[in-house]
Amino acid sequence: MSAIVDIIGREILDSRGNPTVECDVLLESGTMGRAAVPSGASTGSREAIELRDGETGRYGGKGVLKAVEHINTEISEAIMGLDASEQAFLDKTLLELDGTDNKSRLGANAMLAVSMAVAKAAAEEAGLPLYRYFGGSGAMQLPVPMMNIVNGGAHANNSLDIQEFMIVPVSQPTFREALRCGAEVFHALKKILSDRGMSTAVGDEGGFAPNFGSNDECLSTILQAIEKAGYRAGEDVLLALDCAASEFYHDGKYQLAGEGLQLSSTEFADYLANLADKFPIVSIEDGMHESDWAGWKTLTDKLGKKVQLVGDDLFVTNTRILKEGIEKGIANSILIKINQIGTLTETFAAIEMAKRAGYTAVISHRSGETEDSTIADIAVGLNAGQIKTGSLSRSDRISKYNQLLRIEEDLGDIASYPGKSAFYNLR
């Protein structure tokens, strides 16, 4: 039995300099698991609640000492002595201890830190790499990365309304080669921006944040960077968008301030369809407001057979909401953010539900990250096929890519890279 003998919670800083929660779990054998949780900038209203202190005189109210105290007191008391290898039972214990629908009492940040740290300790105890502990012998597929090379919206201080413009390397035989492709396109884009006298400062997720005049101009420039790096747009590298449309939906209209447009749901669906016709876009995330289900249905009917339509704020990694979306034919993919739901067991349930319904699942970071690379192991362990973890700069993003390189090396000849087949529900 891998009995838990000690739990230590602490307050650390994330990549934005804001406090977040880290947890150490020590087992009877002396093995330890350590995990740190991320935090988002654009958040869905139905996400599990991360507990913040609210003391304005300390970290602007963003401290997490209350969440840490919960770990070091009642969570510690509840799980002390439990078997770390019984993840589902441990997560159930946390859920019952919290007792709320949205984890608002203990805080999803406290609960997730413990859930992840326990899994890491159990994997160490079993002598298994984390991805293998999660997925068993069937874990051998590396994920296709969506690399956020231009930031807009809530992630950058510029005039772009769409939050993320991503490149998706798909023709490469290995993850290592896909990562190289992404890095080369990133540096080609930097040179193009520099030559134009545009900003090469980066946003929260490591992508550039220049002031383009329109989304079209931004996408056209990315195509130039792909070609400059020696790759073929639409063949070697595809494009993906995260609209984060909930951020610019006001008074029943999609208000693209950067382009001076105010669009209805149908008009915005047409706007996105036009972009998908002009550019090799394979995936669009949060293309409608999280509560605009009629708009989502319109978008899905219009684009759902040829473009991956990812629900992030829409589904918030929640199986109850995902089930409703599947039944209504809304979107065709779910973004998986572990801190949106707050335990590993619930995260894995969302991935499995999506797969059973023929939806894809994209494992994702948050804009406020740490050096913790657990999501890389989840992507491989659960055979998700896709990961979204930022640009080719900032060590908080690169830590996940580097972990995937290590996993691919560890897998050796049995490692596979799915490329375009990761988008298995498109025609």
UniProtKB/Swiss-Prot annotation:
Cite the annotated pathway.
Answer: Carbohydrate degradation; glycolysis; pyruvate from D-glyceraldehyde 3-phosphate: step 4/5
Say what the protein does.
Answer: Catalyzes the reversible conversion of 2-phosphoglycerate (2-PG) into phosphoenolpyruvate (PEP). It is essential for the degradation of carbohydrates via glycolysis.
User: What GO cellular component is one of the record's annotations?
Assistant: cell surface
- Mention one GO molecular function: phosphopyruvate hydratase activity
Q: What is this protein called?
A: Enolase
Record-listed E.C. numbers: 4.2.1.11
Residues engaged in binding (2R)-2-phosphoglycerate: 163, 337, 366-367, 388
HAMAP family xrefs: Enolase
Q: Which cofactor does it need?
A: Mg(2+)
Residue numbers binding Mg(2+): 242, 285, 312
The record's subcellular location field reads: Cytoplasm; Secreted; Cell surface
Q: How is the cofactor bound?
A: Binds a second Mg(2+) ion via substrate during catalysis.
GO terms for biological process, alphabetical: glycolytic process
Catalytic activity from the UniProt record: (2R)-2-phosphoglycerate = phosphoenolpyruvate + H2O
Q: Lineage of the source organism?
A: Bacteria, Pseudomonadati, Pseudomonadota, Betaproteobacteria, Burkholderiales
- Catalytic residues, chain numbering: 205 (proton donor), 337 (proton acceptor)
- InterPro entries, per database record: Enolase (IPR000941), Enolase-like_C_sf (IPR036849), Enolase-like_N (IPR029017), Enolase_C (IPR020810), Enolase_CS (IPR020809), Enolase_N (IPR020811)
Recite the UniProt keywords alphabetically.
Cytoplasm, Glycolysis, Lyase, Magnesium, Metal-binding, Secreted
